[in-house]
């Protein structure tokens, strides 16, 4: 562990973006401003602000936010004393026009996110962000679903489009430290030395901190976390804990250990609609390696067909389903109900 003594990392805050998921994208401008100012004062260098599903995420499918991306970004950016602001963009949801808008409002970092086997859809957005001279990140989601060799190919594609940092993203909170090490080591070795490596964790198996430290050991210099863990599932890596652990290990974050605790406790916990914890549902997501948005579909299917949502989620994980295949959840539930003799004869 002493090998990390004196190493510096950039802690990237997710409270105001991934944290939009448990808030159903309904954070107020005042909540955004207050939390962002607290994070800024605590020394957090980079803060992500958008709809939970990124720029342009406002839709029937993903949820309508309380305010537009422009309003959220416009409220936060002028107040920042030292922190820079980032925005997430998923090709197919966010467009080049959203990217331009973000740049004009003063967004410093753009993170272009794709499924971990689909980096090729990011070329237009990554190359355009680089043209705008933005800090440009390629963000490979659900990374447990690709092999280290497969992730290397995808990471190199994003790097070739112009990304100056590549993220390995554990969207389901499925990975264990050894999974993180084998993937990040391979990607770190394959990228140019000047290309940064990042890690985004979820706490569904309580591995957020351990995985983040494993990532730092493999050369990651950017680590995502959220105050009080506010994020999808059991939340993101809790920032106040990560900062304290890094401090104990001699890893420099530039974030004040006490101030970030106060932001989490005094500003973030009071706005939670429900406790962010490892409940049965979040644990199943992590155990089965399933994307968080499948949960409600699985619960609906349970009511309709009598197959427990937990069993269905495990099966979806086994089949390697990814975001966008929500229609297959119904099909899988129907098949399982048939196999278990839960359907009336005429339906079978």
UniProtKB/Swiss-Prot annotation:
Transmembrane segments: none annotated. Substrate binds at residues 17-18, 171, 200, 291. Keywords: Aromatic hydrocarbons catabolism, Lyase, Manganese, Metal-binding. Residues 9-261 form the Pyruvate carboxyltransferase domain. The active site is at 21 (proton acceptor). One of its GO terms (biological process) is L-leucine biosynthetic process. Its EC number is 4.1.3.39. GO terms for molecular function: 2-isopropylmalate synthase activity; 4-hydroxy-2-oxovalerate aldolase activity; manganese ion binding. Coiled coil: none annotated. The record marks 17 as: Transition state stabilizer. Belongs to the 4-hydroxy-2-oxovalerate aldolase family. NCBIfam families: 4OH_2_O_val_ald (TIGR03217), PRK08195.1 (NF006049). This is 4-hydroxy-2-oxovalerate aldolase.
């Amino acid at each position: 562990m002493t090998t990390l003594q004196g190493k510096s990392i950039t802690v990237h805050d997710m409270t105001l973006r991934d944290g939009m998921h448990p808030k159903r994208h309904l954070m107020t401008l005042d909540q955004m401003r207050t939390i962002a100012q607290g994070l800024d004062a605590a020394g957090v260098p980079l803060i992500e602000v958008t709809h939970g599903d990124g720029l342009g995420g406002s839709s029937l499918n993903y949820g309508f936010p309380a305010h537009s991306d422009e309003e959220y970004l416009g409220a936060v950016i002028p107040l920042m004393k030292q922190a820079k602001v980032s925005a997430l963009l998923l090709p197919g949801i966010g467009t080049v026009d959203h990217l331009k808008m973000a740049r004009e409002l003063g967004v410093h970092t753009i993170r272009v996110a794709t499924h971990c086997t689909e980096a090729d859809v990011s070329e237009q957005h990554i190359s355009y962000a680089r043209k705008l001279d933005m800090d440009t990140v390629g963000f490979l989601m659900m990374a447990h679903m690709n092999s280290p060799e497969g992730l290397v190919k995808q990471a190199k594609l994003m790097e070739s489009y112009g990304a100056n940092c590549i993220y390995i993203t554990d969207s389901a909170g499925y990975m264990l430290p050894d999974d993180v090490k084998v993937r990040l080591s391979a990607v770190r070795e394959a990228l140019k030395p000047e290309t940064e490596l990042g890690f985004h964790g979820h706490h569904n198996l309580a591995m957020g901190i351990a995985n983040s430290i494993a990532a730092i050991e493999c050369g990651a210099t950017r680590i995502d976390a959220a105050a009080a863990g506010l994020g999808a599932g059991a939340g993101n890596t809790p920032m106040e804990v990560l900062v304290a652990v890094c401090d104990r290990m001699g890893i420099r974050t530039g974030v004040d250990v006490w101030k970030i605790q106060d932001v989490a406790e005094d500003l973030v916990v009071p706005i939670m609609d429900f406790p962010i914890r490892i409940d049965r549902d979040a644990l199943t997501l992590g155990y089965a390696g399933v994307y968080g948005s499948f949960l409600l579909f699985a619960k609906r299917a349970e009511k309709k067909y009598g197959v427990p949502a937990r069993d269905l989620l495990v099966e979806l994980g086994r089949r390697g389903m990814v975001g966008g295949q929500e229609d297959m959840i119904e099909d899988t539930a129907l098949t399982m109900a048939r196999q278990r003799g839960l359907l009336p004869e005429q339906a079978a």
